Amino acid sequence: MANDNNNIQITDESQIVLYQPNESISLQVKIDASHDTVWLTQQQIADLFGTKRPAITKHLRNIFNSGELDQNSVSSILEHTAADGKTYKTQFYNLDAIISVGYRVNSINATAFRRWATRVLNNYLLKGYSVNQQLLAMQRQFDSRLEE
């Protein structure tokens, strides 16, 4: 079962990021900065990857059954306000689940997502490595000056 003691209210004040893999698809993703993640419903994940909701349900079930992810850790019942102004409780999945599903779905949008995720990860790793090397060099210079 989902982690429902973590009822997070998604409000208009949440940071919104627009992910647009191509001209025909754009998805607004609400960032939950307090938990360093994003939350999407199964339908939003299906829209993101250009597939149907039953495919997402199947992939999530396989991910949880295989032990790849723990359902209690990556899903939560969240409250959201619909267009009718009413608040509903809906099951949402965090970034870990979204990425795992993205690597299982076979669609053009999922392939675009995988390319994007790989590019972001490569940039992060390479820039992070570069920054760390610069910091180490600065530390060595500082240490050598202290020794003088």
Feature names for model-found ranges:
Residues E68-A83:
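Short Lys/Arg-enriched helix C-cap and helix-to-coil transition segments
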Residues N62-S66:
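Alpha-helical DNA-recognition elements
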